[in-house]
Amino acid sequence: MKAILLTAGEGTRIRPLSASRPKPMLPVADRPLAAHTADAAIDAGADEIVLVVGYEGETVREYFGEEYRGVPVSYAVQEAQTGTADAVDAAREHIDGPFAVLNGDNLYDPAAIDRLFDACPAVCAAEVSDPRNYGVLSTTDGTVTDIVEKPDDPPTNLANAGAYAFPADAREWLEVPASERGEREITDVLTRVIEQYSVTPITLDRWLDVGRPWELLEANEWKVGELEPRIDGAVSDAAHLEGRVVVEAGATVDPGVVIEGPVLLRSGATVGPNASVRGATVIGEGASIGNGVEVKNSVLSRGASVNHLSAVADSILGRNVNFGAGTTVANRRHDDADVSFTVKGERLSTGRRTFGVVAGDGAKTGINTSLTPGLKLATGATTAPGETVDRDR
């Protein structure tokens, strides 16, 4: 079965992290988000991966190439992001039999994807506490009978998780009309399949739709926690490592460092003397942590630097971010309420009591900068030495 991965979207809700790469290519543990989905599809038996690309599509092509894990890779271009059915329709020429459709910005438990492929036609569902914000599946005797978008009175608590195994006939049903929000929806294709076939619901044990920065942090918490410990890099005998810690070849850990996993140090990463790194944390390729720095539950992307005597917690730093010496990130409110974050101009609760900052590629702080919880630094943003920043910039 071919697996079609949807990776064309820009990911405006996760900006500034998606300013130069599509959301499915943001780092989750040791690979891009979309690679986890591709891995699950291949493990389930996919004999070809078809990647639908659009925004910054060359980033996707550079990573996956023409073959991934021994499986052929093809590409389809979605010229304008006008819905999920439109995205799959862009890959129509690659469809010659039953096919799976997976969102490239979702994490699925791999065992469920395996069951999805075996049960075709089928759709993955997740049990949620409040299904009113999702497409909700109705079922009878183990068969899906309907799907309703964001109902006021949900018939079940089964949310559509955006993973489908379709029969070959569905290729001819992709040209659905635009919905009320102006998009061609893959759920309309699912409705047609439900009318013609017995569709099996596959309940996910775990699922994460990564749409906003704190969900990317959660994705890393999930996947870093699954890594098998190994030490391939240079670790000082005077360093202390415990728990699930991965030090890739080319990474360096200096004397006096304390690392409490789960932590991943990518190739070329350096952790300076007397630093403290706690899970779940990813230190990306070529990223560096200076003398006496504390990093907790954060993602430092490729080439990021946190200089001496700084503290970073529950944060995401884009590529080549540079935090000057003594930069301090606050990650908790005094009233212990959930931290809020601005998404597309709207202040939203993250649902987390601890959340620090999100810094776009190339952002820089002056020495002794203080950053308040839930702060966003745009691509290339700067701060002055000694500044306290309590508004996005």
Question: Residue spans of the language-model regions?
Answer:
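N-terminal glycine-rich phosphate-binding loop and ensuing alpha1 helix
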Residues: 1-61, 81
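Conserved beta-loop-beta/alpha segment of the NTase-like Rossmann-fold superfamily
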Residues: 60-62, 66-141
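Catalytic-core segments of class I nucleotidyltransferases/pyrophosphorylases
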Residues: 100, 117, 140-225
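Extended, small-residue-rich solenoid/repeat segments and analogous flexible loops
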Residues: 180-183, 192-279
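Glycine-rich hexapeptide-repeat left-handed beta-helix
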Residues: 290-393
